[in-house]
Protein backbone atom coordinates (compact mmCIF):
# COMPACT_ATOMS: atom_id res chain seq x y z
CA UNK A 1 0.00 0.00 0.00
CA UNK A 2 2.78 2.41 0.96
CA UNK A 3 4.76 1.70 -2.20
CA UNK A 4 1.68 2.09 -4.39
CA UNK A 5 1.34 5.65 -3.11
CA UNK A 6 5.05 6.34 -3.50
CA UNK A 7 5.02 4.78 -6.96
CA UNK A 8 2.18 7.05 -8.04
CA UNK A 9 4.28 10.07 -7.07
CA UNK A 10 7.50 8.73 -8.57
CA UNK A 11 5.81 7.79 -11.83
CA UNK A 12 4.52 11.36 -12.14
CA UNK A 13 8.15 12.47 -12.46
CA UNK A 14 10.65 12.08 -15.26
CA UNK A 15 11.97 8.52 -14.96
CA UNK A 16 15.57 9.53 -14.30
CA UNK A 17 14.55 12.22 -11.80
CA UNK A 18 12.52 9.59 -9.94
CA UNK A 19 15.46 7.19 -9.94
CA UNK A 20 17.77 9.87 -8.55
CA UNK A 21 15.35 10.62 -5.71
CA UNK A 22 15.18 6.94 -4.79
CA UNK A 23 18.96 6.64 -4.98
CA UNK A 24 19.38 9.60 -2.65
CA UNK A 25 17.23 7.85 -0.05
CA UNK A 26 19.05 4.55 -0.52
CA UNK A 27 22.44 6.23 -0.09
CA UNK A 28 21.24 7.72 3.18
CA UNK A 29 19.91 4.36 4.37
CA UNK A 30 23.16 2.61 3.42
CA UNK A 31 25.09 4.80 5.83
CA UNK A 32 23.05 3.47 8.76
CA UNK A 33 23.42 -0.20 9.80
CA UNK A 34 20.43 0.30 12.11
CA UNK A 35 18.13 1.42 9.30
CA UNK A 36 19.39 -1.35 7.03
CA UNK A 37 18.54 -3.78 9.80
CA UNK A 38 14.99 -2.43 9.94
CA UNK A 39 14.63 -2.82 6.18
CA UNK A 40 15.90 -6.38 6.37
CA UNK A 41 13.45 -7.25 9.15
CA UNK A 42 10.57 -5.96 7.01
CA UNK A 43 11.55 -7.03 3.48
CA UNK A 44 14.41 -9.51 3.77
CA UNK A 45 13.88 -13.25 3.41
CA UNK A 46 16.15 -16.11 4.39
CA UNK A 47 15.65 -19.81 3.78
CA UNK A 48 18.43 -22.43 3.71
CA UNK A 49 16.71 -24.11 0.74
CA UNK A 50 17.74 -21.12 -1.38
CA UNK A 51 21.42 -21.02 -0.42
CA UNK A 52 24.13 -22.14 -2.81
CA UNK A 53 27.91 -22.17 -3.18
CA UNK A 54 28.95 -21.06 -6.67
CA UNK A 55 32.51 -20.40 -7.81
CA UNK A 56 33.64 -20.31 -4.20
CA UNK A 57 31.07 -17.67 -3.25
CA UNK A 58 28.15 -18.14 -0.85
CA UNK A 59 24.83 -16.91 -2.26
CA UNK A 60 22.01 -16.61 0.33
CA UNK A 61 19.56 -16.92 -2.58
CA UNK A 62 19.80 -16.87 -6.39
CA UNK A 63 18.06 -13.53 -6.96
CA UNK A 64 20.37 -10.63 -7.80
CA UNK A 65 19.97 -7.02 -8.85
CA UNK A 66 21.31 -6.37 -12.34
CA UNK A 67 23.90 -3.73 -13.14
CA UNK A 68 22.68 -0.23 -13.85
CA UNK A 69 20.82 0.51 -10.63
CA UNK A 70 23.79 1.35 -8.41
CA UNK A 71 26.17 2.77 -10.97
CA UNK A 72 28.62 4.28 -8.48
CA UNK A 73 28.55 1.67 -5.70
CA UNK A 74 26.97 3.99 -3.17
CA UNK A 75 23.89 2.14 -1.87
CA UNK A 76 24.74 -1.55 -1.73
CA UNK A 77 23.98 -2.04 1.97
CA UNK A 78 20.41 -0.81 1.62
CA UNK A 79 19.77 -2.83 -1.53
CA UNK A 80 21.03 -6.02 0.12
CA UNK A 81 18.55 -5.42 2.95
CA UNK A 82 15.65 -5.70 0.49
CA UNK A 83 16.39 -9.40 0.12
CA UNK A 84 18.76 -9.74 -2.81
CA UNK A 85 21.13 -12.69 -2.75
CA UNK A 86 23.80 -10.68 -4.53
CA UNK A 87 24.21 -7.39 -6.37
CA UNK A 88 25.97 -6.33 -9.55
CA UNK A 89 27.22 -2.75 -9.36
CA UNK A 90 28.17 -0.43 -12.22
CA UNK A 91 28.62 -0.24 -15.11
CA UNK A 92 32.00 1.34 -14.27
CA UNK A 93 34.36 2.81 -16.83
CA UNK A 94 38.04 3.66 -16.50
CA UNK A 95 37.33 7.40 -16.57
CA UNK A 96 34.24 9.23 -15.34
CA UNK A 97 31.73 10.10 -18.04
CA UNK A 98 28.37 11.87 -18.13
CA UNK A 99 26.64 9.48 -20.51
CA UNK A 100 24.19 10.43 -23.21
CA UNK A 101 21.98 13.51 -23.31
CA UNK A 102 18.74 13.58 -21.35
CA UNK A 103 15.99 12.49 -21.52
CA UNK A 104 17.50 9.01 -21.67
CA UNK A 105 15.30 6.86 -19.43
CA UNK A 106 11.67 6.08 -20.26
CA UNK A 107 8.81 3.98 -18.93
CA UNK A 108 6.50 1.78 -20.98
CA UNK A 109 3.92 1.38 -18.26
CA UNK A 110 1.43 -0.84 -20.08
CA UNK A 111 4.20 -3.34 -20.82
CA UNK A 112 5.83 -2.92 -17.36
CA UNK A 113 9.05 -2.19 -19.20
CA UNK A 114 11.79 0.42 -19.34
CA UNK A 115 13.83 1.89 -22.14
CA UNK A 116 17.22 3.36 -21.31
CA UNK A 117 19.84 5.15 -23.35
CA UNK A 118 21.99 6.11 -20.36
CA UNK A 119 25.41 5.51 -21.91
CA UNK A 120 27.45 4.25 -18.93
CA UNK A 121 27.15 7.47 -16.90
CA UNK A 122 29.31 6.98 -13.80
CA UNK A 123 31.91 8.67 -11.60
CA UNK A 124 34.72 6.42 -12.81
CA UNK A 125 36.41 3.37 -11.32
CA UNK A 126 38.63 5.17 -8.80
CA UNK A 127 35.79 6.97 -6.99
CA UNK A 128 33.58 3.89 -7.16
CA UNK A 129 36.32 1.79 -5.56
CA UNK A 130 36.59 4.28 -2.71
CA UNK A 131 32.84 4.13 -2.19
CA UNK A 132 32.92 0.33 -2.19
CA UNK A 133 35.61 0.24 0.48
CA UNK A 134 33.81 2.81 2.61
CA UNK A 135 30.97 0.38 3.32
CA UNK A 136 32.72 -2.99 2.99
CA UNK A 137 32.42 -5.79 3.91
CA UNK A 138 29.04 -6.80 2.50
CA UNK A 139 26.68 -9.62 3.44
CA UNK A 140 26.34 -10.97 -0.10
CA UNK A 141 28.59 -11.37 -3.13
CA UNK A 142 29.08 -8.16 -5.12
CA UNK A 143 29.79 -8.19 -8.82
CA UNK A 144 31.47 -5.32 -10.64
CA UNK A 145 30.21 -4.63 -14.16
CA UNK A 146 32.87 -3.11 -16.42
CA UNK A 147 32.42 -1.13 -19.63
CA UNK A 148 34.34 0.90 -22.20
CA UNK A 149 34.56 4.69 -22.19
CA UNK A 150 32.67 6.24 -25.08
CA UNK A 151 35.65 8.31 -26.27
CA UNK A 152 37.89 5.26 -26.62
CA UNK A 153 38.23 4.00 -30.19
CA UNK A 154 37.60 0.32 -30.88
CA UNK A 155 41.27 -0.34 -31.60
CA UNK A 156 42.07 0.64 -28.00
CA UNK A 157 39.11 -1.15 -26.39
CA UNK A 158 41.17 -3.97 -24.91
CA UNK A 159 43.52 -1.50 -23.22
CA UNK A 160 40.52 0.37 -21.80
CA UNK A 161 38.99 -2.77 -20.32
CA UNK A 162 42.39 -3.65 -18.87
CA UNK A 163 42.64 -0.21 -17.27
CA UNK A 164 39.20 -0.31 -15.64
CA UNK A 165 39.72 -3.88 -14.40
CA UNK A 166 43.08 -2.90 -12.94
CA UNK A 167 41.44 -0.12 -10.90
CA UNK A 168 38.84 -2.56 -9.56
CA UNK A 169 41.08 -5.49 -8.64
CA UNK A 170 40.70 -4.86 -4.92
CA UNK A 171 36.92 -4.58 -4.91
CA UNK A 172 34.09 -6.97 -5.63
CA UNK A 173 33.78 -10.74 -5.72
CA UNK A 174 33.45 -11.21 -9.47
CA UNK A 175 33.69 -9.13 -12.65
CA UNK A 176 31.36 -8.88 -15.62
CA UNK A 177 32.52 -7.55 -18.96
CA UNK A 178 29.74 -5.58 -20.60
CA UNK A 179 30.13 -5.70 -24.38
CA UNK A 180 26.39 -5.71 -24.99
CA UNK A 181 24.99 -2.31 -24.03
CA UNK A 182 23.33 -0.69 -27.06
CA UNK A 183 24.03 2.80 -25.71
CA UNK A 184 27.76 3.11 -26.43
CA UNK A 185 28.39 3.46 -30.18
CA UNK A 186 29.76 0.26 -31.75
CA UNK A 187 30.24 -1.46 -28.38
CA UNK A 188 28.27 -4.50 -29.50
CA UNK A 189 30.70 -4.98 -32.37
CA UNK A 190 33.14 -6.23 -29.73
CA UNK A 191 30.93 -9.30 -29.29
CA UNK A 192 33.11 -11.30 -31.63
CA UNK A 193 35.20 -14.41 -31.16
CA UNK A 194 38.59 -12.75 -31.50
CA UNK A 195 38.04 -9.83 -29.14
CA UNK A 196 36.33 -11.92 -26.49
CA UNK A 197 39.22 -14.38 -26.56
CA UNK A 198 41.76 -11.59 -26.07
CA UNK A 199 39.68 -9.99 -23.33
CA UNK A 200 39.32 -13.06 -21.15
CA UNK A 201 42.88 -14.24 -21.71
CA UNK A 202 44.01 -10.82 -20.49
CA UNK A 203 41.65 -10.75 -17.51
CA UNK A 204 42.59 -14.27 -16.42
CA UNK A 205 46.20 -13.13 -16.12
CA UNK A 206 45.15 -10.18 -13.93
CA UNK A 207 42.82 -11.81 -11.40
CA UNK A 208 41.76 -15.14 -9.94
CA UNK A 209 38.25 -13.86 -9.22
CA UNK A 210 35.37 -15.23 -11.34
CA UNK A 211 34.88 -13.58 -14.73
CA UNK A 212 31.56 -13.23 -16.57
CA UNK A 213 30.49 -12.10 -20.03
CA UNK A 214 27.15 -10.32 -20.46
CA UNK A 215 25.62 -10.87 -23.88
CA UNK A 216 22.95 -9.13 -25.95
CA UNK A 217 19.62 -10.77 -26.80
CA UNK A 218 19.84 -9.55 -30.39
CA UNK A 219 22.67 -11.78 -31.61
CA UNK A 220 21.86 -14.58 -34.02
CA UNK A 221 21.90 -17.86 -32.12
CA UNK A 222 24.92 -19.27 -33.94
CA UNK A 223 26.86 -16.03 -33.41
CA UNK A 224 25.93 -15.98 -29.74
CA UNK A 225 27.07 -19.56 -29.22
CA UNK A 226 30.36 -18.87 -31.00
CA UNK A 227 31.09 -15.81 -28.86
CA UNK A 228 30.17 -17.61 -25.65
CA UNK A 229 32.30 -20.60 -26.55
CA UNK A 230 35.25 -18.30 -27.21
CA UNK A 231 34.79 -16.64 -23.82
CA UNK A 232 34.62 -19.95 -21.96
CA UNK A 233 37.65 -21.37 -23.76
CA UNK A 234 39.59 -18.22 -22.85
CA UNK A 235 38.72 -18.47 -19.16
CA UNK A 236 35.25 -17.03 -18.56
CA UNK A 237 33.60 -18.67 -15.56
CA UNK A 238 30.06 -17.60 -16.39
CA UNK A 239 27.66 -16.04 -18.89
CA UNK A 240 24.94 -13.49 -18.13
CA UNK A 241 22.08 -13.57 -20.61
CA UNK A 242 20.76 -11.10 -21.50
CA UNK A 243 21.26 -7.35 -21.65
CA UNK A 244 18.57 -5.01 -23.01
CA UNK A 245 17.18 -5.42 -26.52
CA UNK A 246 17.04 -3.01 -29.44
CA UNK A 247 13.99 -4.82 -30.84
CA UNK A 248 11.54 -1.91 -30.79
CA UNK A 249 8.65 -4.11 -31.93
CA UNK A 250 8.27 -5.36 -28.36
CA UNK A 251 6.54 -2.20 -27.10
CA UNK A 252 3.70 -0.11 -28.47
CA UNK A 253 5.40 3.30 -28.51
CA UNK A 254 9.19 2.90 -28.44
CA UNK A 255 11.61 5.79 -28.25
CA UNK A 256 14.23 6.09 -30.96
CA UNK A 257 17.23 5.46 -28.71
CA UNK A 258 17.98 2.94 -26.01
CA UNK A 259 17.55 -0.67 -24.98
CA UNK A 260 14.35 -2.24 -23.68
CA UNK A 261 14.04 -4.24 -20.46
CA UNK A 262 11.21 -5.60 -18.38
CA UNK A 263 8.24 -7.79 -19.24
CA UNK A 264 8.51 -6.99 -22.95
CA UNK A 265 11.82 -8.88 -22.93
CA UNK A 266 10.59 -12.02 -21.14
CA UNK A 267 9.98 -14.24 -24.16
CA UNK A 268 13.06 -13.13 -26.10
CA UNK A 269 15.39 -13.50 -23.14
CA UNK A 270 13.95 -16.89 -22.23
CA UNK A 271 14.44 -18.19 -25.77
CA UNK A 272 18.05 -17.01 -25.90
CA UNK A 273 18.74 -18.53 -22.51
CA UNK A 274 17.22 -21.85 -23.53
CA UNK A 275 19.65 -22.13 -26.47
CA UNK A 276 22.54 -21.02 -24.28
CA UNK A 277 21.75 -23.63 -21.64
CA UNK A 278 21.39 -26.42 -24.18
CA UNK A 279 24.93 -25.78 -25.33
CA UNK A 280 26.72 -24.76 -22.14
CA UNK A 281 24.92 -26.12 -19.08
CA UNK A 282 27.51 -27.82 -16.84
CA UNK A 283 30.27 -26.12 -18.84
CA UNK A 284 29.78 -22.66 -17.34
CA UNK A 285 27.80 -20.85 -14.66
CA UNK A 286 24.71 -19.46 -16.39
CA UNK A 287 22.88 -16.37 -15.15
CA UNK A 288 19.46 -15.50 -16.55
CA UNK A 289 18.16 -11.93 -16.67
CA UNK A 290 15.45 -10.28 -18.72
CA UNK A 291 11.76 -10.02 -17.93
CA UNK A 292 11.78 -11.96 -14.66
CA UNK A 293 9.10 -10.53 -12.38
CA UNK A 294 7.63 -13.44 -10.41
CA UNK A 295 8.52 -16.78 -8.89
CA UNK A 296 7.01 -18.77 -11.75
CA UNK A 297 9.35 -17.20 -14.31
CA UNK A 298 12.29 -17.39 -11.91
CA UNK A 299 11.64 -21.10 -11.36
CA UNK A 300 11.37 -21.77 -15.09
CA UNK A 301 14.77 -20.15 -15.71
CA UNK A 302 16.33 -22.17 -12.88
CA UNK A 303 14.97 -25.44 -14.28
CA UNK A 304 16.25 -24.38 -17.71
CA UNK A 305 19.77 -24.18 -16.28
CA UNK A 306 20.21 -20.86 -14.49
CA UNK A 307 22.33 -21.06 -11.36
CA UNK A 308 21.62 -17.39 -10.68
CA UNK A 309 19.03 -14.81 -11.71
CA UNK A 310 18.94 -11.03 -11.99
CA UNK A 311 16.11 -8.52 -12.03
CA UNK A 312 15.91 -4.77 -12.59
CA UNK A 313 12.74 -3.38 -14.18
CA UNK A 314 10.48 -5.55 -12.04
CA UNK A 315 12.02 -3.97 -8.93
CA UNK A 316 11.00 -0.55 -10.25
CA UNK A 317 7.44 -1.60 -11.00
CA UNK A 318 6.81 -3.83 -7.97
CA UNK A 319 8.81 -2.19 -5.23
CA UNK A 320 10.46 -3.42 -2.02
CA UNK A 321 8.22 -6.47 -1.54
CA UNK A 322 9.38 -8.06 -4.78
CA UNK A 323 12.37 -10.12 -3.58
CA UNK A 324 10.50 -11.45 -0.58
CA UNK A 325 7.48 -12.38 -2.70
CA UNK A 326 9.54 -14.13 -5.37
CA UNK A 327 11.68 -16.01 -2.87
CA UNK A 328 8.78 -17.19 -0.69
CA UNK A 329 6.87 -18.43 -3.72
CA UNK A 330 10.02 -20.01 -5.16
CA UNK A 331 10.40 -22.13 -2.02
CA UNK A 332 6.78 -23.28 -2.43
CA UNK A 333 7.42 -24.27 -6.04
CA UNK A 334 10.55 -26.19 -5.07
CA UNK A 335 8.66 -28.05 -2.34
CA UNK A 336 5.75 -28.82 -4.67
CA UNK A 337 8.10 -30.56 -7.10
CA UNK A 338 9.98 -32.39 -4.37
CA UNK A 339 13.26 -30.48 -4.53
CA UNK A 340 15.05 -30.17 -1.21
CA UNK A 341 16.97 -27.09 -2.35
CA UNK A 342 17.27 -24.69 -5.25
CA UNK A 343 20.56 -26.36 -6.14
CA UNK A 344 18.69 -29.58 -6.97
CA UNK A 345 16.37 -27.75 -9.36
CA UNK A 346 19.08 -26.11 -11.49
CA UNK A 347 18.90 -27.60 -14.97
CA UNK A 348 16.09 -30.01 -14.07
CA UNK A 349 14.55 -29.63 -17.53
CA UNK A 350 17.84 -30.71 -19.12
CA UNK A 351 18.13 -33.96 -17.23
Swiss-Prot record:
Q: Does the keyword Flavoprotein apply?
A: yes
Localization, per the record, is: Cell membrane
| Signal peptide segment | none
The annotated active site, in chain numbering, is 181
Q: Does the keyword Cell membrane apply?
A: yes
UniProt cofactor(s)? FMN
Q: In which pathway does it act?
A: Pyrimidine metabolism; UMP biosynthesis via de novo pathway; orotate from (S)-dihydroorotate (quinone route): step 1/1
Record: residues binding FMN? 67-71, 91, 145, 178, 214, 242, 262, 291, 312-313
Cofactor binding note of this UniProt entry = Binds 1 FMN per subunit.
Q: What is its main location?
A: membrane
Which residues hold substrate? 71, 116-120, 178, 183, 243-244
Q: Which GO terms describe its cellular component?
A: cytoplasm; plasma membrane
Similarity comment: family membership: Belongs to the dihydroorotate dehydrogenase family. Type 2 subfamily.
- Would you tell me the protein name for this molecule? Dihydroorotate dehydrogenase (quinone)
Specify the species.
Helicobacter pylori (strain Shi470)
